[in-house]
């Protein structure tokens, strides 16, 4: 990552151009990440010349995303952010009873992959987010006194389709910035093989989630056109390599669509897909997700009893599986529901 590519590199360069000692940049990052100061004018520990230069470069605020709409439910908050060019993205904060806070952030404005059950793609693809725009979603929550316990790239867009993703992860794991452990971060993918391979090499401890949704190649290609480019069989081989290299569990997301992918044959095919892969096969975990309805798709919600039966079939075959407990569906903040066209 080039030093001046992200805002933090630019901040360091600005201090250097002013011929200030290195500790001034350290004071700046501490003001952001220890004192949670979002306004450069309020960073009184910094020389006035540096504060003015920072405002001239970035504007008065550290964060570049502006919240313009918010919806809350009992355990979820969905925020609509506007970017400096007027584009919009959504992010979701989740709060659990134990006090744990998790945040689902976006990596793209819209999505180009056209998964039939997902509302995000209906808005079309606008552009990739920069590394700063990705991480600034979290800065907003942090500046508003939230605890960044865990992060998931499960918002709008396919994370591995955005080259800026890895710079964003570097920022998140930099001990002088966000300082997050790799194991507190989860990246979800529809199966972009080069992205999985790069993650394996560069961030082996980051959690990986793979969106399966059908164990049959032809049906998966129909539901998820990306399967024609990266067939399931090839993706699974790549996931095997990831597990062998990292020793880490891979989560396989499976949205339950009534009458589409919920049959006994589907369960048996999943069992066949995960069996006899090798000594590491126990590190695959199936995450069954109740479908969240939207006005953008025509699929139907599967009953909880049917989902539990599907899960039971997998478990009887010694497949690790659970049914995901979801929050935020009532405010369209759950899996597959993010679509900023619904707002305002």
Swiss-Prot record:
Cellular compartments annotated: Cytoplasm
Residues annotated for S-adenosyl-L-methionine binding in this entry: 157-158, 188, 211-213, 292
Disulfide bond sites: 104-335
Record's catalysed reaction(s): adenosine(2503) in 23S rRNA + 2 reduced [2Fe-2S]-[ferredoxin] + 2 S-adenosyl-L-methionine = 8-methyladenosine(2503) in 23S rRNA + 5'-deoxyadenosine + L-methionine + 2 oxidized [2Fe-2S]-[ferredoxin] + S-adenosyl-L-homocysteine
PROSITE patterns: RADICAL_SAM
EC number: 2.1.1.224
Domain Radical SAM core: residue ranges: 97-330
A GO term, aspect molecular function: rRNA (adenine) methyltransferase activity
Highest taxon in the source lineage: Bacteria
InterPro entries attached to this UniProt entry: Aldolase_TIM (IPR013785), Methyltransferase_A (IPR040072), rRNA_lsu_MeTfrase_Cfr (IPR022881), rRNA_lsu_MTrfase_RlmN/Cfr (IPR004383), rSAM (IPR007197)
Needed cofactors: [4Fe-4S] cluster
Active site (catalytic residues): 90 (proton acceptor), 335 (s-methylcysteine intermediate)
Gene3D superfamilies, A to Z: 1.10.150.530, Aldolase class I
Keywords: 4Fe-4S, Antibiotic resistance, Cytoplasm, Disulfide bond, Iron, Iron-sulfur, Metal-binding, Methyltransferase, rRNA processing, S-adenosyl-L-methionine, Transferase
HAMAP family (UniProt xref): 23SrRNA_methyltr_Cfr (MF_01873)
Family: Belongs to the radical SAM superfamily. RlmN family. Cfr subfamily.
PANTHER family tied to this protein: 23S RRNA METHYLTRANSFERASE, RADICAL SAM CORE DOMAIN-CONTAINING PROTEIN
UniProt name for this protein: Ribosomal RNA large subunit methyltransferase Cfr
Lineage start: Bacteria, Bacillati, Bacillota, Clostridia, Eubacteriales
């Amino acid at each position: 990552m080039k030093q001046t590519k992200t805002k933090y590199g630019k901040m360091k360069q600005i201090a250097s151009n002013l011929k200030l000692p290195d500790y001034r940049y350290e004071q700046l990052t501490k003001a952001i990440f220890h004192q949670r100061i979002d306004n450069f004018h309020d960073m009184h520990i910094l020389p006035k010349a540096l504060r003015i230069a920072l405002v001239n470069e970035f504007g008065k605020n550290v964060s570049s995303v502006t919240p313009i709409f918010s919806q809350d439910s009992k355990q979820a908050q969905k925020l609509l952010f506007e970017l400096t060019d007027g584009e919009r993205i959504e992010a979701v904060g989740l709060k659990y009873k134990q006090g744990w806070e998790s945040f689902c952030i976006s990596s793209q404005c819209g999505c180009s992959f056209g998964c039939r059950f997902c509302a995000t793609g209906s808005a079309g693809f606008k552009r990739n987010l920069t590394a700063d725009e990705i991480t600034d979603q979290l800065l907003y929550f942090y500046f508003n006194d939230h605890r960044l316990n865990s992060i998931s790239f499960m918002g709008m867009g396919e994370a591995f389709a955005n080259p800026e993703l890895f710079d964003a992860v570097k920022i998140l794991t930099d001990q002088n910035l966000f300082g997050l452990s790799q194991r507190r971060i989860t990246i979800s993918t529809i199966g972009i093989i080069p992205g999985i391979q790069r993650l394996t090499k560069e961030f082996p401890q980051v959690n990986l989630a793979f969106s399966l949704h059908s164990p049959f190649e032809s049906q998966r290609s129909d539901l998820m056109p990306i399967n024609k480019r990266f067939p399931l069989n090839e993706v699974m081989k790549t996931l095997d390599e990831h597990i062998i290299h990292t020793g880490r569990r891979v989560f396989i997301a499976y949205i339950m669509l009534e009458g589409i992918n919920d049959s006994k044959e589907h369960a048996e095919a999943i069992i066949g897909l995960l069996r006899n892969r090798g000594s590491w096969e126990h590190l695959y975990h199936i995450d069954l997700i109740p479908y969240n309805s939207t006005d953008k798709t025509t699929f139907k919600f599967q009953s909880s009893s049917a989902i539990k039966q599907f899960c039971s079939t997998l478990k009887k075959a010694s497949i690790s599986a659970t049914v995901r407990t979801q929050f935020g569906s009532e405010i369209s903040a759950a899996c597959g529901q993010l679509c900023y066209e619904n707002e305002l």
